[in-house]
């Protein structure tokens, strides 16, 4: 530059992009190292890609590991990271290892203390640059070799025709660069960002009272803050889950909890099975601690502590069929696996809309209607009754079957009752409205999975009452 007397380095095309991306990825690597364990680490990345992407894809056609198709949330994000790490190598060899991999960065820091290292035996060299052209880490073995960038591919040893490069215990004769290529200002900026990232992202209070009640962790999970510290997002727990209910979380736990395991009761074949502890025994970091079946069910030595609870089911009365629409349904109560059941029902009777049969006539066990208004056999389910009141008689009789203009009852209705004494004839439905006992509910989610209300279920599991964090309890504790 003629104004300041310094040489100008010109970047064009992809060089501009990769130069900028390199600084960004280095900074991101520092932040990720302190904030998101396993997010870009190579081993969890491979396991996560296999578990959430490759195996489900293989099962969709060949059923290699599962008889049923397995589904995982956020598969597009997993695929994006996996294929980006794979195909960016076509632009720059070993792109992931050189610019992204946090494990490679750690090895680079420790590499300066290695006993054995690549280097020149003598400084004299023909400068053919064959070693540089074959170097996988672009660490410039022909000159001052960048020790933190060397991946020990050994290509330079086999490429040098003069055999000037060796794997020795002494330093390279042409000199070494042992420090990372990061200025003091850049180091300070990266360190400040890394240190400030966690408290800034936790300002929303997700680990306190502002926790997401829809975030259900697998049984045996540690308290949330410790769970996030340990979980490496490998996806092994989701892979071994027999019902496919464990899913990689994308949004509920925030950026700290990206790809951590959470239960989605709507997916898979059922909820969390009572006799299964597979996820707790495969977790490599004990973010989900190993538990026995006795501990999960609260039996034997664990009877006093009770079963492990991952949440509590709540009935949404605005969507529940018996509560909101006067339609008989006890699916959640029937499927509750706890004994005695955590879901019980309260019986009541409600008059069906348009069920005033004041113009009907009773003949023995048959009710004759003046108009053909009924759908044949619709009332023969055992939940419909005819309520008759008149004089001193008040009787409710179950319906066996019906035609368009007649109803057959299970027994004769008050044969001594005169037709002139009838005050009310109504068509009623027996409703069994579900109730949840929070002292018995373990949050397994089978009721939510089996609920016939599609979309937003009428009964849903919430994290309140989970065993791993007593502060999430919604019940008053005795003094």
Describe the predicted segments one by one:
Residues 1-479:
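Non-ligating segments of multi-cofactor redox enzymes
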